[in-house]
């Protein structure tokens, strides 16, 4: 038995380095002003997919992501770890999407890919923390869904057996294929990049990532696998009104950058006088009563 697996992955801003230019005037994320990383829980999802690929010979794993051309790096990171292919949804008409528009775009792409057995993604992205996209994709495709997965244990008789977190413990469930699964950050961590695969795919790019002046450009004709799939709204037969800002009823009004400042401290000795003074100060400021 072989499986066709699609991993939903996202290039996200590194939220440890959010500055004053993080948002645009329209209330969308200014991704060009922020360092970008592979969404952590999507790496957990990728690991589950790669384990299934090893468990069921002949299976394939593809990375599906949406973003600007530089998001092609997410596909490369997947290829370096053992994925077989990838698709980048990139089009100005996809820009500014909330979870509803994002899930619509991903669902139309999955329909174009066709005959998918499992769609696996991280529980949520660190830039939005909504945990909505996976379930929304399942709803739009009319597929079964399992959330908060810790491990995809086996595929047997057309069903996936999944161990998932619940309040106060874990449960094991079965879900008929095809199924959408979202994976927790506490699941098995992603394997490191494979050196041989890095050498094989380091020049793998989408057409919009290239300038045409790369010294390795002649390799593209010799090695077709170095050209990654790049799809626009038209390529996936999408409705422009349901994509990007046009299809996004959610709008971010403001984002505030909170700066924590240390207050002045003082050292209190253990003398009776200092202790009495401290208690009086706390009472006066109504910190204790």
Regions found by a protein language model. Name each.
Residues 1-289:
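N-terminal glycine-rich FAD/FM-binding segment characteristic of electron-transfer flavoproteins
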């Amino acid at each position: 038995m072989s499986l066709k697996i699609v991993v939903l992955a996202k290039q996200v801003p590194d939220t440890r380095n959010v500055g004053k230019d993080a948002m645009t005037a329209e209330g969308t994320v200014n991704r060009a002003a922020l360092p970008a990383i592979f969404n952590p829980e999507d790496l957990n999802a990728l690991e589950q997919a790669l384990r299934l690929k090893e468990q069921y010979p002949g299976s394939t794993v593809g990375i599906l992501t949406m973003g600007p051309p530089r998001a092609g790096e997410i596909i490369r990171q997947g290829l370096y770890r053992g994925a077989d292919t990838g698709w980048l949804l990139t089009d100005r008409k996809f820009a500014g999407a909330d979870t509803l528009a994002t899930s619509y775009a991903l669902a139309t792409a999955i329909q174009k890919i066709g005959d998918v057995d499992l769609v696996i993604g991280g529980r949520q992205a660190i830039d939005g923390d909504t945990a909505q996209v996976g379930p929304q994709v399942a709803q739009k495709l009319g597929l079964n869904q399992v959330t908060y997965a810790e491990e995809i244990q086996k595929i047997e008789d057309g069903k996936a057996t999944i161990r998932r977190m619940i309040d106060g413990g874990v449960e094991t469930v079965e879900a008929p294929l095809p199924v959408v699964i979202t994976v927790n950050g506490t699941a098995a961590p992603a394997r490191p990049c494979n050196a041989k695969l890095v050498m094989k795919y380091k020049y793998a790019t989408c057409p919009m990532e290239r300038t045409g002046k790369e010294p390795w450009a002649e390799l593209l004709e010799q090695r077709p696998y170095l050209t990654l799939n790049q799809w626009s709204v038209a390529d996936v037969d999408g409705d422009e009104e349901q994509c990007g800002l046009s299809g996004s009823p959610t709008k971010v009004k403001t984002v505030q950058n909170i700066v924590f400042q240390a207050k002045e401290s003082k050292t209190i000795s253990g003398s009776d006088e200092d202790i009495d003074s401290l208690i009086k100060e706390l009472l006066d400021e109504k910190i204790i009563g």
